[in-house]
């Protein structure tokens, strides 16, 4: 085994070592600070066999079809936690089943949560008076767009909410939220 002489080993000066240490520390801090930003723009998808997000109640418990229909009547529109945790309306259709689509409850004007007014049979925003029909289509401004749609699927009694990327059936246009 041969040993290298001291003249064959490159020397690192104190200044070069401190520069590398400072650069390495600054790079580590910058990457650590960028992680939440990257995670915001590319969030992890929550589980569900078919790629959907499990709809959750106000306590964060997964919703089941049988449990939901036992406590909600036909025509009911109630809030659940949907995609990205956004408030989403599950609709019980007139046949007594859960509708095939849900509505994101965030007003397209300034982001207020839009409550369902069963007396007026429409969604009315409390912030600036925007109104949406039973399917979430804007009928009175200042909201410029209809409420976002989401697919609602049932898999093994679990209620799943999935991204809607097809044509918006209310306007026959591409979805603005996709």
Curated annotation (Swiss-Prot):
It is found in: Cellular thylakoid membrane. It comes from the Bacteria. GO terms for biological process: photosynthesis. The chain crosses the membrane at residues 20-42. Disulfide bonds join 112-127. Binds 1 [2Fe-2S] cluster per subunit. It is a single-pass membrane protein. Its EC number is 7.1.1.6. [2Fe-2S] cluster binds at residues 107, 109, 125, 128. CDD domains: Rieske_cytochrome_b6f. Keywords: 2Fe-2S, Disulfide bond, Electron transport, Iron, Iron-sulfur, Membrane, Metal-binding, Thylakoid, Translocase, Transmembrane, Transmembrane helix, Transport. One of its GO terms (cellular component) is plasma membrane-derived thylakoid membrane. Residues 65-161 form the Rieske domain. Its main location: membrane. SUPFAM superfamilies: ISP domain. Component of the cytochrome b6-f complex, which mediates electron transfer between photosystem II (PSII) and photosystem I (PSI), cyclic electron flow around PSI, and state transitions. The 4 large subunits of the cytochrome b6-f complex are cytochrome b6, subunit IV (17 kDa polypeptide, PetD), cytochrome f and the Rieske protein, while the 4 small subunits are PetG, PetL, PetM and PetN. The complex functions as a dimer. Belongs to the Rieske iron-sulfur protein family. This is Cytochrome b6-f complex iron-sulfur subunit. It comes from Prochlorococcus marinus (strain MIT 9215).
